[in-house]
Amino acid sequence: MTRYNPREAEPKWQSAWDACDAFKAIGPSASNNKPKYYVLEMFPYPSGRIHVGHSRNYTMGDVVARYKRARGFDVLHPMGWDAFGLPAENAARDRGVHPGAWTHDNIDAMRGQLQRLGLALDWSREIATCDPSYYRHQQAIFLRLMERGLLHRKTAKVNWDPVDQTVLANEQVIDGRGWRSGALVVQRELDQWFFKITEYADELTDALEELDRWPDKVRTMQSNWIGRSRGAEVSFPLTDSGLAEQFGATIDVFTTRPDTLFGASFLALAPDHPIVKALAADDPEIDRFMHECARMGTTAEEIEKAPKRGVDLGITVRHPFDENWELPVWSANFVLSGYGTGAIFGSPAGDQRDLDFARKYDLAVQPVVLPPEASADTHVIEDEAYTGPGTSYNSRFLDGLSTADALERAITELEARKLGKGATSYRLRDWLVSRQRYWGCPIPVIHCADCGVVPVPEDQLPVVLPEDVTFDHPSNPLERHPTWKNADCPKCGKAGRRETDTLDTFVCSSWYFLRFTSPWSEDTPFLASDAEHWMPVDQYVGGIEHAILHLLYARFFTRALNDAGLMNMKSGEPFAGLFTQGMVTHETYKSADGKWLSPEEVDLRKDGAVEMSTGKPVSVGAIEKMSKSKKNVVDLDAFIESYGADAVRWFVLSDSPPERDVEYTDSGVEGVWRFVQRLWSTVTSLPEGAPGPLTVAADASGPALEIRRAAHKALHAVTDAIEGFRFNSAVAQVHDLVNVLRKYVPSDDAGIAAKTEALGILARIIAPFVPHLAEECWEHLGGEGLVIDAAWPEADPALLVEDSVTLPVQVNGKRRTEVTAPKGAAQDVVQEMVMADQTVQRALEGLTVRKVIVVPDRIVNIVAG
């Protein structure tokens, strides 16, 4: 029989699926009584090419989509493009191509790659967030949420590159310098737009408990990011009457540990706190410190990594529990004005950051919480703070109380003294969505000198990006455009100015899953009836790197749109199930001069790796996730050209649990290719005239019955594995079944029927994984229509009962193989099974069987000579 040829089979079956719109979702209709199932992978950014690492995400979602379709569901499995973003502008600068042209060329290329991968996608619903037909509705959503008070504009700090004259994202600041210019970055305050996500902080936190089909790790990450915590607002009276008159009588601080107030040894203010700014005007040291901090990175990670630095402001405050106790006030680089009040009190014995700061500047360290089992006489704090619970001591009226009781008692005392109160605080801040970029969704407002900020009327949407822009200067092209920003005020008709900021691309990805439910809707972002039918997404698949921002913003948006009346979902949760897949990894390679090399540029020899173009030695580095920056990617098209799409799919699902990384190796790929051929040869080994693949060999007995039993057990196990997202387990079950079927050579019609039934089951259970090969097998077996239209088989419970034993088979005392037989099977039945085994037959070639010894349920020994 000929070998399986994916170059012929895969285009053939993809054309067949396209011809009948096989994967087009039906949606809500009176004639559709199928249950719905919405499966979605996080849509890609069209960066140019999809590599093998990317394919794992889409393949996993595709397995679920195809499986659910076979189980009788009406499946929505769409695809689109997260198409705005900075890389397109960088390409415009570096290559002289318009961002739109670059983006759409990439979309065309990547769409072709996904189609060649054989994904069961409903392409009729394809969207791209850079198309005006999409962002028109995003602008309408912006105006609706603005009307509801969920948007506001205020000044906020940004990273400003003084050479490129542009705002930089945090990741574009490297060691305090702009990534392109190398200039020292400074902090600037600009007017920015914010979504009031904080208004949903409690709801977003509480609802995490309901997401029982999300990974615990992701729920914990979101909970920590929102950071709801019970504590107290504490007021420290200023001792300087002049400052008190100018800035208020107290410096207010939020703390989660008011029980440690008696361990306080200092207050610290953010470098840009109003009091610090006022004092800096007359103190060069404070002024210098303030400006040095303005050049620091602003992410929590950067702040945490930076050495702790501060400056004594030369002022003091009174302790709220003792008016005779004065605490020095410092400014510290680890205090941020955007968090809380921009002020903290330092209790060094109970906080590592405070302890590091106190040791550096020789501030007092007073332990106030005694750990369990510790002694007050011997407990000391040296280089490590104690942050856990315990018993209060050195704390006057709190002495002897547990941490929980001391916290409540401290709040009661603060409230009695009118110097504080119990409060709940959140780490979450309102979502800054302004970007000083061209390639993004325009913000639909006009600035008028008389009327202020005026929304663009909805009948004038979309506000479309101008095409005639240049990228010869790094600043925002919209700001420099000679005419686009000029617009009349919709209220008074006077000359106004368009907003030249665009929206954060996370806004685009915060509602795209809703647009997929009715992408043809012209008057509304989506049809409420369709959204209510399809939502929530039943299974969402994507990387752990999106665990916080994207998923949190999407949860906020769904609630906000629900509350705005655009739909009436029972739950505000957009994703009922979430799976975060592992990466595909690969060795990394560096040339002798330190440049990253792709696998295609390296010759792996027994005596070491060399660069093909130079013959020079190559350094083989760590196995890391495939990334373009390190060039350790394997091109998807090249893989498909060599081995076929099904081999890609099978490889990325094999060996490793889907939540873990899987390593790309040439040997692993070759193993997959051999298995594909082995499976095909097993299917084509049936004799001509065999019955069709829906055969049920109900009368099978002996070896034929065991073949049926193996097939139904594999069916049951694969079904269970897919339902549990254990795709590697399903792959292993298929391997085992193929091995069993290869060894079985039927000797009569009952055996042929049993093997045909088993192969029919095999063709259907591999269809979600290797759909082209499954179609080819189904056709060869004589199946009617397409295998994707065949119902998922049901395992016969009677065949799942464990009533068989595995018997080792020896030939002349040497173990050759093993067979599975019914418990207590008669010796002649076991002997027939053994003699039909191909491995046994090969071992007996040229020999005469003299005796077959069957020890019931134990072992079989063949004596031959």
UniProtKB/Swiss-Prot annotation:
CC terms in the record's Gene Ontology section: cytosol
Record keyword Endoplasmic reticulum present: no
Lineage top rank: taxon: Bacteria
Enzyme Commission designation: 6.1.1.4
Motif ('HIGH' region) on chain: 44-54
'KMSKS' region, short sequence motif: residues: 625-629
GO molecular function: aminoacyl-tRNA deacylase activity; ATP binding; leucine-tRNA ligase activity
Reactions that this protein is recorded to catalyse: tRNA(Leu) + L-leucine + ATP = L-leucyl-tRNA(Leu) + AMP + diphosphate
GO biological process, one term: leucyl-tRNA aminoacylation
Binding sites annotated in the UniProt record for ATP: 628
Alphabetical list of SUPFAM superfamilies matching this protein: Anticodon-binding domain of a subclass of class I aminoacyl-tRNA synthetases, Nucleotidylyl transferase, ValRS/IleRS/LeuRS editing domain
Pfam short name (any one): Anticodon_1
Alphabetized InterPro entries for the sequence: aa-tRNA-synth_I_CS, aa-tRNA-synth_Ia, Leu-tRNA-ligase, Leu_tRNA-synth_edit, M/V/L/I-tRNA-synth_anticd-bd, Methionyl/Leucyl_tRNA_Synth, Rossmann-like_a/b/a_fold, tRNAsynth_Ia_anticodon-bd
Subcellular location: Cytoplasm
Keyword terms of this UniProt record: Aminoacyl-tRNA synthetase, ATP-binding, Cytoplasm, Ligase, Nucleotide-binding, Protein biosynthesis
Keyword Cell membrane attached: no
UniProt xrefs under HAMAP family: Leu_tRNA_synth_B
Family indicated by similarity: Belongs to the class-I aminoacyl-tRNA synthetase family.
PANTHER family: LEUCINE--TRNA LIGASE, MITOCHONDRIAL (PTHR43740:SF2), LEUCYL-TRNA SYNTHETASE (PTHR43740)
Protein name, entry field: Leucine--tRNA ligase
